[in-house]
């Protein structure tokens, strides 16, 4: 009896937690130029932009954490894209980036401006354009 009661309480807690989760927001489809022209409008929002990979850098931190950064080039305008992990993209690939845009973000002593965080844990992704 006691085991069933405990199991019932655990089940209710799980259902309650699942009900509180919000679905991932639909990203705002925009352009690199629009992000650069009006960064306040998109700050901390999920965006989707298309462009070409330029200045690709795949690194591993001293702590062993892999990351990828590149410039997303579209119509002569560029914006930085960051993601944890080594992405399967190459220089000059045409890609679709979904991620959280930051007008300005501080990480430790560094400040990053006009950057998209496309990390999967942030709900982001980078995929090759079909």
Q: Where on the chain are the PLM-derived regions?
A:
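Bacterial N-terminal signal peptides
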Residues: 6-16
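OB-fold and OB-like single-stranded nucleic-acid-recognition modules
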Residues: 19-130
């Amino acid at each position: 009896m006691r085991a069933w009661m405990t199991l019932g309480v655990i089940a209710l807690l799980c259902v309650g937690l699942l009900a509180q989760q919000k679905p991932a927001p639909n990203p705002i489809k925009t352009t690199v130029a629009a992000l650069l022209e009006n960064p306040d409008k998109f700050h901390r929002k999920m965006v989707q932009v298309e462009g070409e990979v330029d200045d690709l850098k795949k690194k591993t931190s001293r702590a062993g954490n892999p990351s990828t950064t590149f410039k997303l080039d579209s119509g002569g305008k560029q914006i930085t894209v960051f993601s944890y992990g080594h992405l399967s993209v190459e220089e000059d690939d045409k890609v679709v980036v979904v991620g959280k845009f930051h007008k300005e973000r501080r990480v430790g002593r560094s400040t990053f401006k006009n950057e998209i965080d496309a990390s999967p844990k942030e709900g982001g992704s980078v995929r090759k354009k079909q």
